[in-house]
């Protein structure tokens, strides 16, 4: 089981679990309120997070969702506190509240193209035989941007969208220079080909770079990224996006010039990013 990590008196996070697609969960501890980031992918995930927080005498008061995907909202009922979502996330939650998560219905949605095998398999693994999922309505609904004063520390929540999920939010903690990006920099998985689009990526990176952060959280990355490491990832995305436009999505040409620009052979991760941009080029 994952152990809660303390980065400061204000900032704690629980690392992700790849096998069952558990994302990072986090707590921002203010003098008056404690904000939790995402609810987890099951009641068990949420319970584990709450127990880990309790070992530091921390209890959440309010929770913010990064987006609507199952692994971020299935723990919402167990969290049992007011929650914050943008209106797009709210609408998607209302939609999936009606779903059954039993094998038969999951498999039917995969067959219909509503669900994807990756998520269906992870849901079956995480939930086991406990398939009754209750997702309560989010409490506070916003559009655009919202600022929270937790007492001695603040949080800015901004709806930024992106390829992965149009409802994606980022959360910025100015006093900690910490930026939680949820899944917004990941590819669109609900498509025939997992992909990035050049235009959406450019707009998203512009918004992200407007925040003065020194520590960055991607929900399924093992731990936070420092400024240099995150900057390298952003540079890769920018170069790949530019070359995708320049070469009209020609994989071979993009790989050739990218390798030349970087002065090295591309890694598997590099090639995955190239593949996503090529997959999204129209």
Where do the PLM segments sit?
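Active-site-proximal loop/helix segments of hydrolase catalytic cores
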Residues: 154-209
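Conserved beta-strand hairpin/beta-sheet module of binuclear metal-dependent hydrolase folds
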Residues: 2-51, 169-183
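Active-site environment of divalent metal-dependent phosphoester hydrolases
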Residues: 22, 43-44, 68-74, 90-93, ...
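Divalent-metal (often Zn2+) His-rich catalytic cores of metallo-beta-lactamase-fold enzymes
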Residues: 79-84, 199-255
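Active-site neighborhood of phospho(di)ester-bond hydrolases with catalytic His/Asp-centered motifs
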Residues: 36-40, 61-69, 84-87, 159-161, ...
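Metallo-beta-lactamase
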Residues: 6, 95-158
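Active-site metal-binding motif and surrounding structural segment of the metallo-beta-lactamase
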Residues: 44-89, 212
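C-terminal regulatory/interaction regions
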Residues: 245-282
